[in-house]
């Protein structure tokens, strides 16, 4: 039997968002403890308390991926300025990876970014996220110079022209 996959706005399921954000950030801090400093710079504790505020329409977005009703992935979009936005918090639970969910989440957020009127989307993954980095490249993201204040030396910086 095929699973039912739904990509939906997450504003009415913030407890699911928080759980996925926590799993995502725990994974990153495990790979590089310096990532905790970056989370602090980003005021992550505030974001976790009120995730909808940072990613609210009309300039932002927040989505969940559900498989058979279960929240298994997330993605967010935030405004940097009038022409640039940033993809944040792309995460799919390990047992659901390899099913194309990350690709679906990215497609949804890039469609929204185009509709909002952004000209490009930026993101700053860690190289340890090899599968994600490979996917970003496949989807047309390319490396750019540093665009933020990440203290994690290994951070990569990508852009997608919309």
What are these regions (language model features)?
Residues 47-64:
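A short helix-loop-beta-strand connector motif used in the catalytic cores of GNAT acetyltransferases and
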Residues 57-58, 79-88, 97, 116, ...:
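A conserved beta-turn-beta hairpin within the catalytic core of GNAT-like acetyltransferases
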Residues 64, 70-79, 86, 91:
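Conserved beta-strand in the GNAT
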Residues 94-97, 122-132, 149-154:
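Conserved beta-strand-loop-alpha-helix junction that forms the acyl-donor binding cleft
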